[in-house]
Amino acid sequence: AIRRQRQMCIRDSFYDSKKSGGITVSHLRFGSSPITSTYLINKANFVACHNPSYVNKYDMVQDLLPGGTFLLNCIWSPEELDANLPASMKRYIAQNNINFYTINGIKIAEEVGLPGRASTILQSAFFTISGILPVDEAIGYMKEKVVAKFSKKGEAVVNSNCNGIDRGSKEVVKIDVPASWADAKDEENDYEVPTNRPEMKKFVKNILHPVDRLHGDDLPVSAFLDSADGVYPQGSAAFEKRGIAVDVPEWDPTKCAQCNLCSMVCPHAVIRPICMNEEEAAAAPEGTKMIKSKRTDYQYALITSV
């Protein structure tokens, strides 16, 4: 829409190295003259975070220019932001006069019949905030695209997307940043890698976690000396829990047939049936649901690993 209606030059870069649901970082440049920059953006005017779990895992605002705009898709009310945002993010927002907006695109998507598909809603919020195009004009272009793309899927799909576009424009919230955020204090992080293998602890702490947080380019060559021959400790996938799901399914023991088919078809081994003896059941984490196994004397539980 920007390129077509304003005769602007556009350059974009999208990259996702993981499987379905992995993080995708999109870099978009546009302007009235040809764009010759071949590098990723590190001084942005606008940054949007589409998944609230990313705020505690990645540096979401550090590439924003002072006075830039940050849009966060989250389920938190303005009053709940202080308790849920990391101190480093709050400091940067306050100290650099960042224009901070939130929108509950997750709730909107569910209510308009597009669960898990908030991208159109957030795009509408982007045009509303940025002022790149007049809001009514931008929304009109978006709806034209929706009709052209989804008309074959029926009127209901078209209406759901159009309703999402309207609500994305109307329900974005401007946050008044508290002055206290400028002095937000970091909490102590005493995370201990849960393994008794010294080489794995070192690998996870020095390489795996920094790479997972997109800080791999900051690692010195010395960090890889123990793996100079290209050999890495096996079993490291257990420490790559991304924790990015907004919603996690809950097992209902009253409706479970203990067939374990759900575990068999789960592609990521997230659903895990477990049988426990009395001692193991007593030592299970607080709140663990369990029932008597139909086939043994053990206690049966279906655990969701996230």
Regions found by a protein language model. Give the residues of each.
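Single conserved hydrophobic/aromatic residue that forms the stacking wall/gate
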Residues: 1-6, 10
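Alpha-helix C-terminal capping/helix-to-coil transition sites in glycosyltransferase folds
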Residues: 5, 42-44, 66
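A structured beta-alpha segment of the ubiquitous adenosine-cofactor-binding alpha/beta core
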Residues: 12-61
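Solvent-exposed alpha-helices and their adjacent loops that cap or buttress functional pockets
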Residues: 17-22, 38-42, 62-64, 91-95, ...
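ADP-ribose/adenylate-binding Rossmann-like module
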Residues: 61-100
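Short alpha-helices
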Residues: 84-149
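Ferredoxin-type iron-sulfur electron-transfer modules and their immediate structural context
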Residues: 138-139, 151-306
